[in-house]
Curated annotation (Swiss-Prot):
The gene is ycaD. It comes from the Bacteria. Coiled coil: none annotated. Belongs to the major facilitator superfamily. YcaD (TC 2.A.1.26) family. PROSITE patterns: MFS (PS50850). Pfam families: MFS_1 (PF07690). PANTHER family: TRANSPORTER MFS SUPERFAMILY. InterPro entries: MFS, MFS_dom, MFS_trans_sf, MFS_YcaD, MFS_YcaD-like. This is Uncharacterized MFS-type transporter YcaD. The lineage of its organism: Bacteria, Pseudomonadati, Pseudomonadota, Gammaproteobacteria, Enterobacterales. GO terms for cellular component: plasma membrane. It is found in: Cell inner membrane.
Amino acid sequence: MSTYTRPVMLLLCGLLLLTLAIAVLNTLVPLWLAQANLPTWQVGMVSSSYFTGNLVGTLFTGYLIKRIGFNRSYYLASLIFAAGCVGLGGMVGFWSWMSWRFIAGIGCAMIWVVVESALMCSGTSHNRGRLLAAYMMAYYMGTFLGQLLVSKVSGELLHVLPWVTGMILAGILPLLFTRIVNQQTQARHSSSISAMLKLRQARLGVNGCIISGIVLGSLYGLMPLYLKHQGMANASIGFWMAVLVSAGILGQWPMGRLADKFGRLLVLRVQVFVVILGSIAMLTQAAMAPALFILGAAGFKLYPVAMAWACEKVEHHQLVAMNQALLLSYTVGSLLGPSFAAMLMQNYSDNLLFIMIASVSFIYLLMLLRNAGQTPNPVAHI
């Protein structure tokens, strides 16, 4: 059976359109709030409400998938996200936008859980690495193209909202032409997120998602600030961020194939070691281009490989709950990482950004080295 089936390809096409919309809004919302003369702390609170929505959406989407299936859950998630987008046009204000971004955050998290769970349930232990690589390539490509759109079109609120909303609704269309079967509905026993988080054999995967959240959240959120403090102009900052994201895109497919062929544990060990090397190289500031490239190529692939590791340790009917637990772990890491790194940078030195990334990666590497090997016959093999 082909890895990239028709439902998988249509699902990824829809994700690409939705990710474009997410990238555009995540970039422009803080700018719109600043133009409305809201204080910085309120802009930060609006951003936090979006991530809080992510947490909430992650928690209940598994139940929703079990009740109404993948397709309808995807439609509902997209409509919630579209509502959060349309609502921004009503009134620019702190409480109003905090509410609408919370709603948008719920919708976005639901989309991620549905897409990731559908891919996990569509694949086997032999091809999940490639499926998740394709997922991350679509996600990062959408993010990259979204940034290009922001630089090419009008940034006025009432000019942007109509076509972004249209793009969200267009993201629903591909799934109208296929049906993704939810094999969980036949399972007698449902699994909870807390049970998945406590599962001993999947702990390396859960920890990997937390570490991935810390690393990527810190790079996304604080790398521009680090480069700004190095005296770079906005154009240069954009170039180096493009190098970072492009490396993440290019590293997805080969890493996914290697993980399927040689095992996730070995690939995770190599990836984490490369992240440490890239972080140390950034401290020297001698060769920023190769340092950023290897940091992006290895760091951006941690999440899908760790996810594939955890998902092969559970029964097939537990995959949705496990995916919720992993996305929740990643979200927690992406909230904690930038906050802690920003505090270190403000009080001590900007270089502590990379020291922190190297330190948490080293801790995870020790966890990986303690594991003697992989399960020879993964549980979720069908």
